[in-house]
Regions:
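C-terminal cap of thioredoxin/glutaredoxin-like
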Residues: 4-32, 113-196
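Structural alpha/beta surface segment adjacent to cysteine/selenocysteine redox centers
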Residues: 14, 18-115
Length: 196
């Protein structure tokens, strides 16, 4: 991943239910190969931390909306992880390691499904390792890879590049030419921009 990459990029953080919804359809919606780039959403300028629910009713309404979208798209029933939001740093370092070994997409999809269809807290390393094992990543290699300074630096660099490209929150699709499309519902607009 370089500053002058020629193809589009899909930015995600595994703690985001919106990114989960988008991830489940990026491959089918975008008309060209798109690089999946894990970022630490909290390092983006306008990231929604999802900690601002005024009450449990607000939280339930949010997840009800996500559940309706998931059901309409034929996804597995939504099971919000407890606690939510969870600390995704370890999971995002594993996603960065997965990117370095060519397993970004299968790992991200498995991890999103663990979190939002399985109701598993991805701040628990064992839950992340289950997702990694589902895409043939050995637990020892994953644990060692996530602990590398170079992996932490790569995640930081990806987050900084995303911010320079105008990514404010996840999910987001950056297209060559500099346009950024934020949110699950913007995938169709990104697809149109990619064929224009």
């Amino acid at each position: 991943m370089t500053e002058d990459a020629v193809g589009p990029a899909f930015y995600f953080d595994l703690f985001s239910p919106e990114a989960y919804l988008a991830a489940e359809r990026v491959l089918q919606t975008l008309p060209v190969a798109t690089e999946w780039i894990p970022v630490a959403a909290l390092g983006l300028p306008a990231a929604d931390t999802l900690q601002g629910f005024r009450c449990e009713t607000d939280r339930e309404a949010y997840f009800d909306r996500i559940a309706r979208v998931a059901e309409r798209r034929g996804l597995q029933p939504l099971r919000p992880p407890q606690p939510f939001p969870f600390d995704s740093l370890f999971a995002m370092r594993v996603a960065t390691y997965a990117k370095q070994i060519g397993r970004t997409v299968p790992f991200a999809l498995a991890a999103f499904r663990q979190a939002f269809a399985g109701g598993r807290d991805l701040s628990v390393p064992d839950n992340v390792l289950i997702a990694a094992a589902a895409c043939e990543m050995h637990p020892n290699a994953v644990t060692k890879g996530a602990a590398l300074r170079s992996v932490a630096a790569a995640l930081d660099d990806a987050t900084a590049l995303a911010a320079r490209r105008g990514v404010r929150d996840v999910p987001a699709v950056w297209v060559p030419g500099g346009e950024v499309f934020h949110g699950d519902e913007a995938l169709e607009q990104a697809a149109q921009a990619l064929v224009a």
